[in-house]
Design a protein with these regions (language model features):
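Juxtamembrane low-complexity tails/linkers enriched in Ser/Thr-Pro and polybasic
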Residues: 18-30
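Structural micro-motif
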Residues: 145-147, 163-177
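N-terminal intrinsically disordered, acidic low-complexity segments at the extreme N-terminus
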Residues: 1-19
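Structural microenvironment flanking redox-active thiols in thiol-disulfide oxidoreductases
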Residues: 106-145, 154-158
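N-terminal "domain-start" segment that seeds a small globular fold
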Residues: 32, 37, 53-84
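Thiol-/selenol-based redox modules, centered on thioredoxin-like
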Residues: 171-209
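Short active-site neighborhood of thiol/selenol oxidoreductases, capturing the structured segment around
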Residues: 82-106, 111
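Hydrophobic membrane-insertion alpha-helices, especially the h-region
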Residues: 38-53
Length: 209
């Protein structure tokens, strides 16, 4: 017996084609939504990581050393020479900072100058930068800072372990080193936020003497 051939209905064929196209389009849309979700989730994770890292890296750190402070002799912006031995018997607070171009660093020193508590406590603050006089003096004049800055070629900053503590590997960060009258390091603090209220700084320093 001969097999009867089924004729394809054009309407059915068109409906099948439309259903296939619709299914294909839905699959593409679902894939796009999935990719979008993955991208958004990735961005959220990256941003959250950056925020956590930023908060973590901006935390102040401090330590009590207790060792003999490295000796040094440096030229100043005033054209004089300063040595650690000049302050034997007196507490000294070294202020290492990024120097020229760092407005927050210069503002910090301006704030310290305005606080009479340091002088009243007999504490001498020596700001140290890796600049020449020509580089740093305009900043000091701009912020009205009168204290002479000590000009370091990096030797002293390295000796005190302050290099790379800020945004630049080859420069000091924003840190302080307290040396007592016997030449002993009593405290070291680093502040990546580039600012420490002078009143809090004074209180912290006095608590370590």
């Amino acid at each position: 017996m001969a097999t009867k051939t089924q004729k394809t209905n054009p309407r059915q064929t068109e409906r099948m084609r439309l259903r296939q196209e619709l299914a294909h389009e839905k699959a593409k849309m679902a894939k796009r939504r999935l990719i979008t979700r993955i991208v958004i989730a990735t961005v959220v994770v990256i941003v959250a990581g950056l925020v956590v890292y930023g908060v973590w890296s901006a935390r102040p750190t401090d330590s009590t050393a207790g060792g003999q402070a490295p000796a040094f002799t440096l030229q100043t912006t005033a054209g004089t020479t300063v040595s650690m031995s000049d302050y034997r018997g007196k507490p000294v607070l070294l202020y290492f900072n990024e120097g020229a171009g760092c407005g927050a660093c210069t503002q910090q020193m301006a704030g310290i100058e305005k606080n009479p508590g340091f002088a009243q406590a007999g504490i001498t603050v020596l700001p140290i930068v890796m600049n020449t006089r020509a580089q740093i003096q305009p900043d000091l004049d701009s912020y009205g800072v009168k204290t002479p800055y000590l000009l370091d070629d990096g030797t002293v900053s390295k000796a005190y372990g302050t290099l790379g503590k800020g945004m630049h590997a080859g420069l000091p960060g924003h840190g302080f080193v307290l040396i007592d009258g016997s030449g002993i390091e009593r405290w070291q603090g680093d502040y990546p936020s580039m600012w420490l209220d002078p009143a809090i700084l004074l209180q912290t320093v006095k608590s370590h003497l």
